[in-house]
Amino acid sequence: MTNKHRYAGIPRWISLPAACAVLFLLVPFIALLIRIDWVQFPHLFSQALSSQALALSLRTCIASTLACIIVGLPLALVCARARDTWWSRVLRSMVTLPMVLPPVVAGLALLITWGRRGLIGAYLQIFGINIAFTTVAVVMAQTFVSLPFFVSSLEGALRTRGFNEERVASGLGASPSRTLWSVTLPLMIPALVSSTALAFSRALGEFGATITFAGSLAGVTRTLPLEIYLQREESTDMALMLSVILVFVALVLVGGASAFSQWWYSRLLSGTSADEAKVPTASRLATEHSRGLGNKDGEAQGQLPRVPVPGVRIAGTLPERHINVDLTCQGGVVTALMGHNGAGKSTLLSVLSGALDAPQMTYTWEWPDGASGRQPKIAILEQKPVLFPHMSLLANVAFPLRCAGISSAEAEVRAREALESVGLAGLEQRRPAQVSGGQAQRTALARALVVAPEVLLLDEPMAALDVEAARGLRELIAQRFLGRTVIMVTHQIEDAAALDAHIIVLKGGRLLREGLWRELINQSISHADESDSALLAMGLSALERALGQE
C-alpha cells in the first residue's frame, strides 16, 4: 500500500503543525535528560529525603487510585447508562468540575470541608479525628483531583463501546449482577486499565491541592512533587533527578496500559484452532437432514419439542416514527414483516422484544388455551449477531443455561449438542472474531436453541450473509423451529418462500396488505398496480429461484 493511499484524506500541510506539537512536547524532556548529571544519579537517589518522598508518593497514589476504582467505576457506569436528561447533565458537570478548577482551589475546598473548623471536620474533631495535614489528607487530595479523570475516561470508553452485549445478556436471562460480572467488567478491562493509569499518573503529579490541604511535612505529607519544588532552590541536580523519576513512572504507566490493551485485544482473537474439514457447510448440513436424520421420537435432530406457543396482536401508534398499526401474528407459524426502509418493521420487532419503550403501543400474547398476557420466552437473531467477544462459541451458547441455574457440566454438554446440531462441531473453542459471519449467525441460532424459545424474532439475519450461508441459515431455522412462532423482518421474498411465511406488508408505518406468500405473489402478478409495486419490487426473480429449488 502506497503512502498516497495510506494517508488518503489527510492534507500534507497537516504534518507541519503536527510535527510542531510533537517537538513542543518532546524537546523539554530531551533537555531534562541532557541536563542531568548521570554520574551523581545513584548518590542523589540514595539520599533519605528523596527516597522518603518517592515511597510516600507511591503509597498514597496506590491508595487514591484504589479509591478511584472503588467509587469511580460505579459512577462511570451510572453516567454511561444514564439517559440524556437534565439531571444526568448536571451529574456529569459536577463530576468534571474538579478537572477545570485550579488545584489550589480544590485544596482550599477540601480544607474548609474536612479541616479542623471545616463543615464536616469540626464534627470529626469531637471524636478526636483530625484529617487535615495528615497522610490521609494527601490521599484525599489526590483522589479529589484524579477521580474526575478516571470517571470521564472510563465513561467515554463505555459510551463508545455501547451496551449491545449487556442488552443481549439481559434478554438471555442474566440478572443485572451476572451481566456486570460476566459481560460488562470483562469487556471494559482495557478501558479500566487505561483509566486507572491516568488516575495514578494524575495523583502522582498532584501538587496544589496537596500543599493546601495536607501541607509539606517530611515523611508525612511531602510527596515527590513537593520535594521537587523544595529542592529546586536548594539543589537543582536533586530536583532534576526526582523529575526524571516522576517522568519515568508516568511513562511506564502509560506504556504499560497501552501494551496491556494490545495484549487483551489480541487475546480476543486467540483460541484453539479446529479442523475446517470437520465443519459441515450449509449444503452438506442440509443434505444430512434431507436424508431423514432424526431422533428416537421422529423429530429432526436438534428440533425443538412441540409445545403450545402464542400468537401476538400489536396495536397502537408511535407518533415520532409515524407508525399506526393493528395487526396479528399467528402462533406456530412464520410471519414475515416486509416493506421498504422506514416502513416500521424493525420498530415493531423492537417493541415486541422490549428494546423500545412505546407507551402508546400495546401488544398481547394470545395463547392456544385462551389465556393472554403471559410473557413467552423470546430469542432474537439480528442482522449482525451479538456474541460475547471474550467468550468462546461454547461459552456463548452455554451462557443462557448458566443464567437459568444449570450446572456448568450440563450446560457445556447441551451447548456442544446445540453447536453440533447447527454444523459447528469442532469450533467450540474459537472466539467470535475467529469465525465467519455465517458461522457467527449459526452460533446465535444454537444459543437460541438451548433457550428453547416459544417465540423467535428475526431482524434480517440473512441480510449480511452470502448466498450459500443465507440458504443454510433459512434451512436451519425452518427445521429447528418448526411449530414455533417466528416473526421475521426481511426485504427478500426468498426468505418468506423458504420459510413458508405469512407476509405482512407495511408502508409508511401502516398495514398495506397481508396473506400467505403464495397468495400475495399470485395477486401481485395477476393484478399489479401501484399499491402492489412495493411487493413486486422486493424481487420476483428471487422468488423464481426459490420455486425452482422445490
Where are these regions (language model features)?
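Membrane-water interface segments at the C-terminal ends of transmembrane alpha-helices
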Residues: 5-38, 48-159, 183, 187-208, ...
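Conserved ABC ATPase "signature" region
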Residues: 175, 410-427
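Conserved ABC ATPase signature
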Residues: 431-435, 439
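A short, proline-enriched helix->beta-strand linker immediately N-terminal to the Walker B motif
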Residues: 450-454
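Catalytic Walker B motif of ABC-type/P-loop ATPase nucleotide-binding domains
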Residues: 456-460
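Helical segment within the ABC ATPase nucleotide-binding domain
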Residues: 470-482
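Conserved beta-strand-loop-alpha-helix hinge in the C-terminal portion
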Residues: 510-541
